Curated annotation (Swiss-Prot):
The modification N-acetylalanine is found at A2. It is found in: Nucleus, Cajal body. Belongs to the FAM118 family. Disulfide bonds: none annotated. Keywords: Acetylation, Nucleus, Phosphoprotein. May play a role in Cajal bodies formation. The modification Phosphoserine is found at S9. The gene is FAM118B. One of its GO terms (cellular component) is Cajal body. This is Protein FAM118B. It holds the Pfam family SIR2_2. It comes from Bos taurus (Bovine). Its main location: nucleus. InterPro entries: FAM118.
Length: 351
């Protein structure tokens, strides 16, 4: 019997199965040395639609610009705010993939008749309908992503997003932590954020749905910031002196708002060191993206072949970076303790 048990044990080892019969996990993607050696305070996290879509995949408005406009249009139709001909016109534009910024602008204008007071418009109602009850729609794997972002924030990383939602702020509140949502209408706060005086604030460069009057779809919408040389100088210094880490962003660097804020006045971009985490996906597309981004000083890194690989990869990266930030100037023993603490904190919050 003992021999049979031993043989079974050997077979189990050969097959690589654990005691519960589960198959072995695939080998995790290695962390890039030039990224994992960063400290949190050296990073600016850029959160794109891919993160929101991963956190609450059942909300179509979080997945893309087109999804958001369609959701706003559906809400407007449900509230009987558009004539039949108007709704057909907007649907046709969406179906034909017309300039989405222009479509969104026209829809907002239609929902904001003859007034600049957003409180008296229907646009606000439609926004709140689209983003209603986001807390209940977050999935656990998405919460793990948000916990990693929050952990880096608390250790000194800055965070900006192109998204209109406040998923990160909602998650933080659920953890008993208060984050502030900023938009480009408040120059003073934007300046303080860029100067690292408001580290627990999230800068929404397109605005956030809880403040409809701060939503901008085009650089013309925040000329106050673009004309403020002090604010722009501080913002551009971030791109020159820190490492931006793009999460769920894809082609965010082609976004006109992002370009106006960070790229247009920055010279020698290829000498900088920024990072973009993306799914490996199509080999040719991945190669093309990597080549294009290098000219902008951005290293494109694959976190895996599947979207589901991102939470675990980013968790490992966060633990590594947080350890280095916490143990700067501390003996090696302190580094090991810090690593254990970082893993423990993230694990505790994500359960």
């Amino acid at each position: 019997m003992a021999s049979t048990g031993s043989q079974a044990s050997d077979i189990d080892k050969i097959l690589g199965f654990f005691s519960d019969g589960a198959p072995p996990t695939k080998k995790p993607r290695k962390l890039l040395p030039s990224l994992k050696t960063k400290k949190p305070r050296e990073l600016v996290l850029v959160i794109g639609t891919g993160i929101s879509a991963a956190v609450a995949p059942q909300v179509p408005a979080l997945k893309s610009w087109k999804g958001l406009i369609q959701a706003l249009l559906d809400a407007a139709i449900d509230f009987d705010l558009l004539e039949d001909e108007e709704s057909k016109k907007f649907q046709k534009c969406l179906h034909e993939d017309k300039n989405l910024v222009h479509v969104a602008h026209d829809l907002i204008q239609k929902l904001s008749p003859r007034t600049s007071n957003v409180r008296s418009t229907f646009f606000k109602d439609c926004l709140y309908e689209v983003f209603d009850d986001l807390e209940s729609k977050m999935e656990d794997s998405g919460k793990q992503l948000l916990q990693s972002v929050l952990h880096l924030m608390e250790n000194g990383a800055l965070v900006l997003t192109t998204n209109f939602d406040n998923l990160l702020e909602l998650y933080a509140a659920d953890q008993g932590k208060q984050l502030e949502s900023l938009d480009l209408t408040d120059e003073k706060k934007v300046l303080e954020w860029a100067q690292e005086k408001r580290k627990l604030s999230v800068l929404h460069i397109h605005g956030v749905y809880t403040n409809p009057s701060g939503i901008v779809l085009h650089p013309a919408g925040y000329q106050n910031v673009l004309r403020n040389t002090e604010v722009m100088r501080e913002i551009q210094k971030l791109y020159e002196n820190k490492s931006f880490l793009f999460l769920g962003c894809g082609w965010t660097v082609d976004d006109t708002t992002f370009q106006a804020l960070f790229l247009e006045a920055v010279k020698h971009k290829s000498d900088l060191e920024h990072f973009m985490l993306v799914r490996r996906g199509d080999v040719d597309e991945f190669k093309k993206l990597r080549e294009n981004m290098l000219d902008k000083g951005i290293k494109v890194i694959s976190y895996g072949n599947d979207y589901a690989d991102l939470p675990e990869y980013f968790k490992r990266l966060t633990c590594e970076i947080s350890t280095r930030g916490r143990s700067a100037g501390i003996v090696r023993e302190g580094q090991l303790n810090g690593s254990s603490t970082a893993h423990s904190e993230i694990r505790d919050h994500s359960t």
